[in-house]
Structures are given as structure tokens and as C-alpha cells.
Regions:
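C-terminal hydrophobic structural anchor segments
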Residues: 402, 406-472
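Short aromatic/hydrophobic contact patches that present stacked aromatics
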Residues: 147, 385, 418
Length: 506
């Protein structure tokens, strides 16, 4: 290995949530038809995971539950047509049984999500990785995916990257019953692409393990002509659409465009015109380059200074009912800021309306298309500036409700809500800032103003002590140990959301 050459491994746990649910039931994750979804949210709910056996019927990993129901119905209609005597005599969720008996209908298990369990198993698996790799050389990309810099370990263990990846994956398999896919690359981008795109093409071994490898040369040879562009990491539909509108359909096209002459239509100037500074990363990835290393990830501190809380309501909410949820969300944002010792002076609220508002045909206002191409009323959006940085529940709630009262349409039902605290600053940084001078007019009473400021400070200090007491109680006894009275009214969501992790059942 050259002195500056590095080796990275990406590992992705196979259908993670579904695999955990199968193992909890003593079932084989590779042979059991199972979806992780909350049926109590109706069949429109999104499936968090689909087992590999069920995916084999053409069901995508993030399908909605009704799509699973419909696809299985279609599969069973075809199985019945081919079954002996045209009859299905039973059903099974076991793939081996279904392949052995053509008279069985395809069945599947629906497992409600248990996020706390998935986090617990993920931490257990991370502990397995730590047996081989130091934490500073591991980046946790998601609950079921990690990236590792294994450059310094190959010589230590006297092994290859493939053997090291396989050793770790088999350790995870034997400990938890969950298998995985791995990608190996000469940089972080290539190991991720090898895992996401190439490992799918590799036949699994006897343990269901797939491992693929890419370097810059093989990346260009194997993937420069690959379509669609959205299969590549960090290329979304918007990027792909812009590129295709300009005749760029593959990563090879993007790479060739980047070296065009200034007087030619296709040159890097076109890419920078389309994507701004983001074109630099797109060009690097088109060539299979990635300058970022693990040390850069560990040293990174995000520049964005906002915190948001959003939720999709279980059903369309009328104006007053949605206002109650907005209050709960604003309270939660304020308490989170206090817990983290962060303050804000700007808040935004976005109110998304339900499709039922346009279904009747009576709505005459401005519309936009939702992700399914349906017309819905354009969302309401507003911003409030506080004039002083704070984490006061009272001030934050008043500001957010003020936006809602001003911007939301009382005649429309609400489906989505997002509250965002902007321009966040740590409390300790505020204390270090010099006090801003106050300019008085001839008609101001400085003494009265001073008394008013002191009264407000006392009020804020009393409120802060109450808020900190609330936080202490919630930390000790749970988030639902103490709530405002509004959270017990019909339509309130805080109690249920406090039982969730990431919007799903804990």
C-alpha cells in the first residue's frame, strides 16, 4: 500500500428493523415475510423496513402499508391461478414453505416499530465493531450503517480489508443473528458507493454476506455509464433533473463536462452555474474523488444554528385543535433549548394544510403540489423576532402562537406543523458579549425603565427556576411525569409523542 493510500469500509445491516423483529420472534430474517409498520396509523403509514424475502416480490423498502397489501394480493391472485385445482389451501409467512408448496398463499407479519429496542441492538453491534476498530476511526452514519477508516489495522491484524469486513460482519451475525452488506473503497465516497450500488450485484455467500470493492479506476470503468443518477450517494431527484435537462445523464457525462474548454457549452462553469459551490463536490464524486477523511468528520462542527420540531398529524386538525398542538411544540422547543443551555431570538412556524381542503373544489386560494402530485393549499409560514435572546417558555410560546394566529387560515384543516428556533447561541457566549448601550429620548424616564428591566429580570429568573425544576422531574420520572393542562385536552399530541423515538413507538 502506498504511503498516502487509505482503505475504508462501509457496513450496512440488512433490513435492520425487520431483522431485529424477526430475531426477537425466533425467525430467520432472510426467510420470513415481515414489515415494520404501525397499523394503528391506517394503511397509509410508511413501512420502516421490509424483510428481504418480502422485497423479493417487488415491494420497495419504504413502501406504504397499503402498497404491501395490494402487492401481496396480486401475488396471491397469481399463485391461485397456478395452484393445483386453482385453490390456495393455506398461507405462510415463511419463504421456504412458500417455495415448497404452491398451494400456500403468501402471508406476512406486521411488527409495530420499537425504536428503543432498535437503538439497544445498534449499540450492541457498535460494541462489536469496537472490538476491532477504535471509535475515532468509526463514523456512525445512521442507526444501521457505519463508515470506518481501517488503513492502520490491516497491517496490525495481517489481513485484507475484505477479510476484516467479513470477520466483523460474521461476529455481528453470530451475536445478533443479523447479517450485513459491506463496501470497501480507497476513500469514504467509494466505500459507500461500493456498498450501496455494487454489493447488491454480488452473489451472497453462505451467510448472506455481500462485499464489494471500488477504487477510482474500477469506479470509472463500472459506474460511469450507470443510470439513473439518483442511485449515487447525494444525488437526489432535483440534481438529476437539472443535469438531465442539460443532457447530462451519467457520472461519466458529469466528469467529461468538468474538463470541457471555456469556449465549449459543456464545461465546469455550467455545473457551477447549476449548483453553485455544491458543483465542486459533484465533480469530485463524478471522478471518484473524496478529500474528506475520518479526522475531518471528527473535527467538523456544524455552522447551522437552528433547531426544529415537526410532526405530521394523524388526521386533519381544525384550526383551534392545531393551535393546541402548536403550543405543545413551542413548549417542547423552549425546554430543549433550556436543557442544552442555548438561547434564540428568532422563531419560525410552518403550517401545512390537508388535501381535504381542495378535494371538495370549494377552495380558491393558492395551491402547490404535494409529493404525490396532488393539489393542496400552499402552506402558511411566518417568522417572529424576539429582540432578545432567550429560552423562556412564555416568550417562545407567545411568539409562535402569535405567528399562528396571524398566518394560519382558520377555514382550513391542518396536517403538518414545524416550529424552528433560529440564530441559536450558547448561553455562555451571551454572557461574554459586551452589554449593548441604550439610547434614551428626552421623554424617557431612565429610572422607570431601569425598574421595568429589573422586574423583568426577576420574572425571568423565577420562570427559569420553574422550568429547570420541570426538566429535573422529566429527567427523573419521564417526559410525561409533568405536563401542562392543555396536553390532556382532546387532540393534544405531546403525551403520545413523548412515548416515541423519532416519531415512532419506543
Amino acid at each position: 500500500m502506498l504511503q498516502n493510500e487509505r482503505t475504508y469500509i462501509a457496513i450496512d445491516l440488512k433490513s435492520y428493523y425487520a431483522s431485529v423483529e424477526c430475531m426477537e420472534r425466533g425467525l430467520d430474517p432472510m426467510q420470513t415475510n415481515l414489515v415494520v409498520a404501525d397499523p394503528s396509523r391506517t394503511e397509509k403509514t410508511i413501512c420502516l423496513a421490509v424483510s428481504p424475502a418480502l422485497k423479493a416480490y417487488g415491494i420497495p423498502g419504504r413502501a406504504r402499508l397499503f402498497e404491501v397489501v395490494e402487492r401481496v394480493r396480486q401475488v396471491n391472485a397469481e399463485r391461485q391461478r397456478r395452484a393445483p385445482g386453482g385453490r390456495l389451501t393455506g398461507k405462510s409467512a415463511d419463504d421456504l414453505a412458500l417455495k415448497a408448496d404452491a398451494s400456500l398463499a403468501v402471508d406476512y407479519l406486521v411488527a409495530p416499530p420499537r425504536m428503543a429496542k432498535y437503538i439497544e441492538v445498534s449499540m450492541q453491534i457498535y460494541g462489536i465493531y469496537l472490538k476491532y476498530i477504535s471509535p475515532e476511526d468509526i463514523h456512525t452514519y445512521s442507526i444501521d450503517e457505519v463508515l470506518m477508516d481501517v488503513t492502520g489495522y490491516l497491517e496490525t491484524y495481517r489481513t485484507t480489508a475484505r477479510e476484516l469486513a467479513k470477520t466483523m460482519i460474521l461476529d455481528v451475525l453470530h451475536t445478533t443473528g443479523i447479517t450485513a452488506t459491506a463496501g470497501i473503497g480507497s476513500n469514504l465516497y467509494l466505500c459507500k458507493v461500493a456498498m450501496d450500488m455494487m454489493a447488491k450485484r454480488v452473489p451472497p455467500d453462505e451467510n448472506g454476506v455481500r462485499i464489494a470493492h471500488l477504487d477510482e479506476r474500477s469506479y470509472r470503468a463500472l459506474l460511469w455509464e450507470h443510470r439513473p443518477l439518483t442511485d449515487f450517494w447525494r444525488v437526489g431527484r432535483g440534481y438529476a433533473k437539472k443535469l438531465e435537462e442539460h443532457g447530462l445523464y451519467t457520472m461519466g457525462d458529469v466528469a467529461r463536462c468538468s474538463i470541457g474548454k471555456p469556449n465549449e457549452y459543456y464545461n465546469e462553469g455550467l455545473l457551477y452555474k447549476l449548483f453553485g459551490v455544491n458543483a465542486e463536490l459533484l465533480i469530485d464524486h463524478a471522478w471518484g474523488w473524496e478529500p474528506c477523511r475520518m479526522a475531518d468528520i471528527n473535527a467538523y462542527r456544524p455552522e447551522t444554528n437552528s433547531s426544529s420540531s415537526g410532526q405530521v398529524l394523524q388526521c386533519p386538525y381544525p384550526y383551534d385543535k392545531a393551535r393546541l398542538v402548536v403550543r405543545e411544540m413551542a413548549e417542547a422547543v423552549a425546554l430543549e433549548l433550556l436543557e442544552k443551555r442555548i438561547v434564540t431570538d428568532q422563531l419560525t412556524l410552518t403550517v401545512g394544510y390537508d388535501i381535504e381542503n381542495t378535494a371538495s373544489g370549494s377552495y380558491r386560494g393558492e395551491t402547490v403540489l404535494d409529493p404525490y402530485g396532488r393539489k393542496i393549499p400552499k402552506h402558511a409560514h411566518g417568522t417572529a423576532t424576539l429582540g432578545q435572546k432567550t429560552s423562556s417558555v412564555r416568550r417562545i410560546v407567545d411568539a409562535v402562537l402569535g405567528i399562528y394566529d396571524e398566518k394560519a387560515d382558520p377555514k382550513l384543516t391542518v396536517r403538518r406543523l414545524t416550529v424552528t428556533a433560529n440564530r441559536l447561541v450558547r448561553e455562555e457566549d451571551i454572557l461574554c458579549e459586551p452589554e449593548q448601550p441604550v439610547q434614551f429620548s428626552l421623554f424617557d424616564d431612565p429610572a422607570a425603565r431601569e425598574r421595568q428591566l429589573r422586574q423583568e429580570e426577576v420574572k425571568q429568573e423565577r420562570e427559569r427556576r420553574i422550568q429547570e425544576a420541570l426538566l429535573d422531574i422529566k429527567k427523573k420520572y419521564g417526559k410525561n411525569a409533568i405536563l401542562s393542562g392543555g396536553s390532556y385536552l382532546d387532540g393534544a399530541t405531546a403525551r403520545e409523542r413523548n412515548r416515541q423515538i423519532g416519531g415512532h413507538k419506543a
